[in-house]
Amino acid sequence: MDTLMPVALIDDDKDLRRATAQTLELAGFSVSAYDGAKAALADLPADFAGPVVTDIRMPEIDGLQLFATLQGMDVDLPVILMTGHGDIPMAVQAIQDGAYDFIAKPFAADRLVQSVRRASEKRRLVLENRMLRKAAEDAQENLPLIGQTPVMENLRNILRHIADTDVDVLVAGETGSGKEVVAQILHQWSHRRKGNFVALNCGALPETVIESELFGHERGAFTGAQKRRTGRIEHASGGTLFLDEIESMPAATQVKMLRVLEMREITPLGTNEVRPVNLRVVAAAKIDLGDPAVRGDFREDLYYRLNVVTISIPPLRERRDDIPLLFSHFAARAAERFRRDVPPLSPDVRRHLASHTWPGNVRELSHYAERVVLGVEGGGAAAVPPQPTGATLPERLERYEAEIIRDTLSANDGDVRRTIEALGIPRKTFYDKLQRHGINRGGYSSRK
């Protein structure tokens, strides 16, 4: 059964209070009714999850004083005023001061219910976004899971339902869509939050190194093993292990990883000692591991072991209504970081936000917002410098090519492998073009 939406009702008229409470309860609300403002203020928490409906004319503390006090507690708390005909001018002023709505007595039940329903939805979104921002801050993550589109609502609901379980999770999504953010949130919202969150990009390490990184090794296990090393899996025991780009994991390592998932134990290199581990594994892939034609050498049994729960993150182009909200958040954060004011949006920036396909997804949008705040004209693709009069076609193509490379580097956080993949050119060609255009790829990475 769904949880009833809470509403606080304050009215000193016993009969009207009872009738109003009954109307709201029949409409599916959970009503906390009070006979005065003092009782309500003593009982209501600052983060009350629903709207407040109050009469204006009450002894001791009237509805307008109550509204002002509640605004001081939480400026986003929706307050609906019930008012007699003579109080309408005061109610209008309260609306201008931030009250959610006023309803003139006598009122139809539907009028009250619809107003409370809209206010409840607004309150739910406000509290939900606060929770997500806090989760992102706690995780020290630069790409929070922000959005109000239905697909993001559904994603958050899934995360809430599974976060506090120990089920292993497979996260699917394009580059820059926020897969590690999802993993961080699963960790922060779980009972493992006090344990370590350990991340490893399987595509960033050569086959000769990845086993030692994951499982650890004893001194002398191989040439160069001067001392004992604790692996990422053991370090994550008690917390969460995040394996990004798991589709890049070597076949031999996949076999060992399957045993970790099944037995929750490891055997470090150079020893026969079996060590138990207690961890949750969140794996991420940018390809469809469920498609045999796509997954290639990735083991089917490992896929099915990870596929207890699969979370798909939609690309930014499929939730375009979230772009203004995300851009606003990233611009505000960049302004604080760079000690700049958020500039007004120019027509070029508005056009770019509306028309760009965002192949780098949320990460690309974040970098674009930073460039806008820094005053780079237009912030990106819209900011290509005017071509000098009389520039030849080859000169224009050279400038355009350089801009595409810069944008792709930015969208991929300076990661060479992902940038080459996105551009579809050989590695040597890529480095030749960097040198020819004088582009320093190090300047495009947000990692310090």
From Swiss-Prot:
Enumerate the spans annotated as Sigma-54 factor interaction domain. 145-374
- Entry-linked SMART domains: AAA, REC
Q: Which UniProt keywords apply?
A: Activator, ATP-binding, Cytoplasm, DNA-binding, Nucleotide-binding, Phosphoprotein, Transcription, Transcription regulation, Two-component regulatory system
Any Gene Ontology biological process: phosphorelay signal transduction system
What are the annotated GO cellular component locations?
cytoplasm
Instruction: Quote the InterPro entries the UniProt record gives.
Output: AAA+_ATPase, CheY-like_superfamily, Homeodomain-like_sf, HTH_Fis, P-loop_NTPase, Sig_transdc_resp-reg_receiver, Sigma_54_int, Sigma_54_int_dom_ATP-bd_1
The post-translation modification note in this UniProt entry reads: Phosphorylated by DctB.
Q: Where is the Response regulatory domain?
A: 6-120
Instruction: Report residue spans for region: Inter-domain linker.
Output: 332-345
Locate the residues binding ATP: 173-180, 236-245
Give the location in the cell.
Cytoplasm
Q: Name one GO molecular function term.
A: ATP binding
Modified residues annotated as 4-aspartylphosphate in this record? 55
- What SUPFAM superfamilies does the annotation carry? CheY-like, Homeodomain-like, P-loop containing nucleoside triphosphate hydrolases
Is the keyword Nucleotide-binding in the record?
yes
DNA-binding positions are 416-435
Q: Which PROSITE patterns match?
A: RESPONSE_REGULATORY, SIGMA54_INTERACT_1, SIGMA54_INTERACT_2, SIGMA54_INTERACT_3, SIGMA54_INTERACT_4
Q: What Pfam families does its record include?
A: HTH_8, Response_reg, Sigma54_activat
Q: Which domain of life is it from?
A: Bacteria
Summarizing the function annotation, the protein's role is:
Member of the two-component regulatory system DctB/DctD involved in the transport of C4-dicarboxylates. When activated by DctB acts in conjunction with sigma-54 to activate the transcription of dctA.
Q: What is this protein called?
A: C4-dicarboxylate transport transcriptional regulatory protein DctD
Query: Which organism does this record belong to?
Result: Rhizobium leguminosarum
